Amino acid sequence: MRAESQLFVSPAPICDRLVTLAEISNRDHILEPSAGTGAILRAIRDTAPEAMCDAVEINSGLVRYLRENFNGVRVQCGDFMEWQSVQYYSRIIMNPPFSHGQDIRHILRAFSLLRPGGVLVAVCLNGPRQQEKLLPF
C-alpha cells in the first residue's frame, strides 16, 4: 500500500461499529463512496444482506475486485467528488481520504446525496476544521 493512494483498509471492528451506528436494515439503499477493498461493504452485507448497495471506487483494479466479490452491489468506477448520482440514499457509510481536508469535502459531498431523514456515518479527524465545518450537521 502506497501512502499517495490513501487506501487504508478499515479494520473489521471499525466497519462493524460504523454499520451499527448507521442502524441499517434490509429496506435501506446504502452508499459506500470510497469502497476500497470492500471492508465496509462486507460489514453491511453481514448485517443487512438484502439492502440495496451502491459503491464508488476510483481505482479500476479495486473496482474489478469489488464487482467480482460483492454480487448485487452496483460498483461505479470514478472519483466520488465528481460522480453524478441519480438518486438519494437512506444510509451513507464511509471512511473517506483524510489528507488536506479531504475528509471534510467528502463528507459534505455525501450529505448532498442523503435522503431527508437519512443517516450518514463517517470516520473523520476530530480537528478544529472538522468541528467548524461538520458540527452544524
Mark where each language-model region is:
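Class I S-adenosyl-L-methionine-dependent methyltransferase catalytic core
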Residues: M1-F137
